[in-house]
Amino acid sequence: FAEMDKNLTETTVPKSTRFGVLVPSESKSWTSGFYPGSLWYTYLYTGNEEIKALAEKNTEKLYIETQIVRSHDIGFMVNCSYGNALRITGDEKYREPFINAAHLLTTRFNPTVGLTLSWNQSKKRPHWHYPVIIDNMMNLELLTQAHKLCGVDSLLTVAHTHAKTTMKNHFRPDFTTWHVVDYEPETGEVRMKVTHQGYSDDSAWARGQAWAVYGYTMMFRETEDAEYLAQAENVAR
């Protein structure tokens, strides 16, 4: 970690490698929280203070992501970094940015659709009106944890509603998932069910299955709603 950190700037974190060379990213990348999150877990396991210092430094690089919302990925980015920092250290300086990020995520929630918006409309995807991807299930943990901290019920309500609506529309009878379900934002009507990263529109996307298993297991842990546990078990089979 220490050697890798030497190749980073004040605003970048590792994203991947290409031909053995580190590929960094800015904080706006959806994976930006994974590096500080990995550092926090390593510190938790080892107690190494140098690792803790790296975790603190790289968590702070994501502060801007607690103040603006670019997409649903704010959950990945902030829960992995600020969420783990707060959970592991108990340092109150991480509390308000974490809670603020959760409230920002709720601004992407459309009560008519019953879901948080994944991607903003763009020239790349002009045919989608209100795309929601199964990945969003991973980002609900930001809401449930923030609800524990601040007690604002709307955070948990959004998480519940999103999970229930996803359960209704994003699964086939055999509990495989559609990657993308596009909605009409004014009515909540389903427009299409497709893939964006999987093999085909009708195939099971392995990563999507994992997102669903984690998301519904987490929702059961936080709410004790047995319907969530049953969903996680069915998806995992």
Language model features with spans:
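Glycan-recognition and catalytic cores of secretory/periplasmic carbohydrate-active enzymes
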Residues: 1-237
